[in-house]
Amino acid sequence: MQYLEGPVSFSRLQKFEGCPWSYYQKYVLKIEEHSGEIAELGKLQHGIIAEAIAQNCAPHADAFDAILEDIAAGELTYGKKDEKELAELWNKYSDHYEELKQRTIKALNLVGETQGEPILEKYFIKRLPCGVSLQGYIDFLIPGKKLWDWKTGHNYEKYINSPQLALNAWGTDELDAERAYVFL
């Protein structure tokens, strides 16, 4: 049996390293895992930030509220495929309004300091010499300039020595771009 079938991502490799049985159940047997609150809040936050950037949202509360109205109504400019899921997540986690707003405004302020046309949630897939493909998503990319990965938790140590950004840069041929985990 070959464990690493199909494309693998950094998070899949982490799962395999941490618990091969859990990896096998999820990616080989296709047994769904329930997402926890932290993962769901992270997905919601990433979706809000992507939508806010796509709509060229100003970094203030009124503009944030307008984005949330679109998300709650399932009417997204950017993340069409995620409309229903983000609306459901917002309905479930609307009590986290203040922290979602603060993180989004922080991200928008950082984006406002950049120059160039951003690409959001850039998917890549690159074949490795061993025959397996590496895949991933880049949260925020300005080709040749910036490669950012939004982090909504504060587990800094987990990422200090992580090869994730280097793998993402290599996978997208963006080796010269400034790479950063952006802790919101």
Which residues are covered by each model-predicted region?
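Nuclease catalytic cores
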Residues: L13-C57, E121-K122
